[in-house]
Amino acid sequence: MLRWQTAGESHGEALVAMIEGLPAGVRISTDDIVSALARRRLGYGRGARMKFEQDKVRLLTGVRHGLTLGSPVAIEIANTEWPKWTEVMSADALDHDLPREGRNAPLSRPRPGHADLTGMRKYGFDDARPVLERSSARETASRVALGEVAKQFLDQAFGIRTVAHVVALGGVQTNPDLPLPTPDDLEALDASPVRTLDKEAEVRIIERINEAKKAADTLGGVIEVLAYGVPAGIGTYVESDRRLDAALASAIMGIQAFKGVEIGDGFLAASRPGSQAHDEIVVNADGRIDRLSNRAGGIEGGMSNGQVIRVRGAMKPIPSIPKALRTVDVLTGESAQAINQRSDSTAVPAASVVAEAMVRLTLAKYALDKFGGDSVAETRRNLESYLASWPEHMR
């Protein structure tokens, strides 16, 4: 069983991520993780923090000479700005009082759309600092690091590869008639400032981001993650909590600021008659079972069906808005403008990298549930044995 967990605060000394249940023999390096984290910092419309935020990575446990050991893998991502925050974020009690100004000024004006107010109520804080430190999207760096480990495992054990791109941002839609990107397009997508292969839409999206920046506003959008090479039969219809589509939806919705998710044609399928909403089964020229379309997004009955898995997520505009919204100062009870932490005009391109990591982690878990072994070699043999058990025309 694959399990993962993250720990750490946005301005704490470090983020820590751990993944347990990974087979022995997965090739992984510190450089792989550093490269993945660099992709998370890409994207037009990012704030000043991305310019100086560097990710210093250490593989602490579970890896020896570039190969996983089968024991828990722990990763540390150090905060290079920690010297500025040592007292404000000190784990130990201080022997002196800090002035309530600058970095230690009380954050008593919660931001609409953020975890601030409800977090303060839930945990009994009179300051939003403890809430925003953990609820910050900085935490996603941990998940991207773990997602890189999952990426290497999926590719090496199963030949599963993923890619993510932006399909809408700030109300600008990319052309749905363009071919879907493949993992071979990763370099081109990373080179795009808004992570799309649609050059016409790219220009219009950049214009929208510039407009939002001038207006001191923020923009949301829609991303899509595609998974290639997923064998049929991952997940199950037997119990609702073991359905693959349910797990993927949960993984995407667990990303900060995501408010919607769909598999395949999703909400569009709801407006079609049944005769135009499903993927007809045919025998192709090679005498094998095939499909005429992929409206289901590679998942039927809670199981992967062998086609490309398509998952989309909708991200709301970032609630840390330079043009601050109205709120209440919880210390005075008076109307006020919300606090404005350093933020981006949009983080949709970067969020696609996070979403890709979450899809990888979910697929790794479910693939291990089906084919798991103690080593990559054993896991691969289990997959090959499973596929060989099918009749020739069903492979």
Curated annotation (Swiss-Prot):
Cofactor note (record): Reduced FMN (FMNH(2)).
Reaction it catalyzes: 5-O-(1-carboxyvinyl)-3-phosphoshikimate = chorismate + phosphate
Name assigned to this protein: Chorismate synthase
Superkingdom per UniProt: Bacteria
Needed co-factor(s): FMNH2
The gene coding this protein: aroC
Enzyme class: lyase
Positions bound to FMN: R134, S135, S136, Q256, A257, G301, K316, P317, I318, P319, S320, R342
One Gene Ontology term, aspect cellular component: cytosol
Catalytic activity, EC: 4.2.3.5
Binding site for NADP(+): R40, R46
Annotated organism of origin: Bifidobacterium longum subsp. infantis (strain ATCC 15697 / DSM 20088 / JCM 1222 / NCTC 11817 / S12)
